[in-house]
Amino acid sequence: MSFVPGQENAGGRSSSVNRAGNGILKKTTWADQTERGPNNQNRGRRNQPKQTATTQPNSGSVVPHYSWFSGITQFQKGKEFQFAEGQGVPIANGIPASEQKGYWYRHNRRSFKTPDGQQKQLLPRWYFYYLGTGPHAGASYGDSIEGVFWVANSQADTNTRSDIVERDPSSHEAIPTRFAPGTVLPQGFYVEGSGRSAPASRSGSRSQSRGPNNRARSSSNQRQPASTVKPDMAEEIAALVLAKLGKDAGQPKQVTKQSAKEVRQKILNKPRQKRTPNKQCPVQQCFGKRGPNQNFGGSEMLKLGTSDPQFPILAELAPTVGAFFFGSKLELVKKNSGGADEPTKDVYELQYSGAVRFDSTLPGFETIMKVLNENLNAYQKDGGADVVSPKPQRKGRRQAQEKKDEVDNVSVAKPKSSVQRNVSRELTPEDRSLLAQILDDGVVPDGLEDDSNV
């Protein structure tokens, strides 16, 4: 005997309020809208099932694999799809515990083009299939398959296939996914259709609240075509909005001196322990020069602060607020207040000391060690980050210095001997008389004062 999810066992009664004649829940879900046409005007004709997110290609032909349940969609990147052992099998009436076994299949959804021309990939959606059905019907429980997560009830026999019929979307609608109490849904995922009501159910509830005088109007409303909301429209709209915001946010913003000054002043107005250094307000403006008590930061990281590309991996080592208070040694110290001319106030310091322990199994260990070695005590290295550039000179002083340099750079011919140095001065009568005695003709030439005649 094959079991049909959503149908009561023999002898059971199905509620006329929540179920139709076949016992299937009639709550409209996104999965149902995927499988049904845009309206219900094709009465009397067999609905042609559309290809759903679980449609799989097989040898050139399309073979649809319809899950009995609505999907689970991922909305946060980087999250893993997983359930605890014994959890993860959706609840369905008429399915005994021994048949509650199967797998969740990851469907990588299509991408779309954003207004700025970029391709965006929708996050995947997961669908449940009983063991022995679906796209991996021939797989055994626990096989290592990419994009497959196996789940089973603690009472289920995973060595045999589930005796569950395949779902025909023309006669059976998808069942809203529900789990047993205590089941923990994977973080970063949500169940399709949870917390959402279809437009038809909303209009029906409104018509019932209006009273008997408006029954004719409510019945006419119920004959309205079903909502033409396309599958994944909510995700597409959200993605388009985010893409638009991302486009605007991604445009380069012009940073003026005034805006940079305002950002810097806003940061410096905060308490010291609440400041976040960045390009507009570097590390040394926030926390002072590097030294023995503040010994972290190389030249590049001191300029960029937390905007440095290497900073996020270091942030993994930062303690949480709880670790800071409960995992550190704290000491409250009263400091001297300001000078005599300043108002009297009590100043305290909450001094702390602690340690962050990690080993080589930490993800990114090699990179963390490299960044730490480059930035610890970087101020002690030659040409380190704490080298202060000379202050610029004023214009008047700079011009005077340039003139002085020009005078200093003038090349002056040096005398070759002491005689040449003496000739450069004016000769006295005594000098002329002495020279006349030395010369044969007794006459001192007029050009004797010139260095070239000596």
Swiss-Prot record:
The yes or no answer to whether the keyword Ion transport is present is no
Give the residues the record marks as binding RNA: 109, 125, 167
The reply to whether Phosphoprotein figures as a keyword in the UniProt entry is yes
Segments carrying the region annotation (RNA-binding) are 56-197
Record's InterPro entries?
N_prot_C_CoV (IPR044344), N_prot_N_CoV (IPR044345), NCAP_bCoV (IPR043505), Nucleocap_CoV (IPR001218), Nucleocapsid_C (IPR037179), Nucleocapsid_N (IPR037195)
Q: Where in the cell is it found?
A: Virion; Host endoplasmic reticulum-Golgi intermediate compartment; Host Golgi apparatus
- Stretches of the chain forming a coiled coil according to its record: none
Which residues are in the CoV N CTD domain? 260-383
Ranges annotated as biased composition (Polar residues): 50-61, 215-227
Matches recorded under Pfam families: CoV_nucleocap (PF00937)
A GO cellular component annotated for this chain's UniProt record is: host cell endoplasmic reticulum-Golgi intermediate compartment
Q: Which residues carry this modification: Phosphoserine?
A: 162, 170, 194, 389, 424
Q: Which residues carry this modification: Phosphothreonine?
A: 177, 428
What are the protein's GO molecular function terms?
Answer: RNA binding
Q: Where is the composition biased (Low complexity)?
A: 193-212
Keyword annotations for this protein? ADP-ribosylation, Host Golgi apparatus, Phosphoprotein, Ribonucleoprotein, RNA-binding, Transcription, Transcription regulation, Viral nucleoprotein, Virion
Q: How is it modified after translation?
A: ADP-ribosylated. The ADP-ribosylation is retained in the virion during infection. Phosphorylated on serine and threonine residues.
Stretch list, region Dimerization: 267-383
Q: Which GO terms describe its biological process?
A: symbiont-mediated activation of host NF-kappaB cascade; symbiont-mediated suppression of host translation elongation
Q: Where is this region: Disordered?
A: 1-62, 160-179, 186-230, 271-292, 382-428
PROSITE patterns listed in its UniProt record: COV_N_CTD, COV_N_NTD
SUPFAM superfamilies per the UniProt record, alphabetical = Coronavirus RNA-binding domain, Nucleocapsid protein dimerization domain
Q: Which family does it belong to?
A: Belongs to the betacoronavirus nucleocapsid protein family.
Q: How does it assemble?
A: Homooligomer. Both monomeric and oligomeric forms interact with RNA. Interacts with protein M. Interacts with NSP3; this interaction serves to tether the genome to the newly translated replicase-transcriptase complex at a very early stage of infection.
Q: Quote the HAMAP family the UniProt record gives.
A: BETA_CORONA_NCAP
What's the protein called, per UniProt?
Nucleoprotein
Q: Which gene encodes it?
A: N
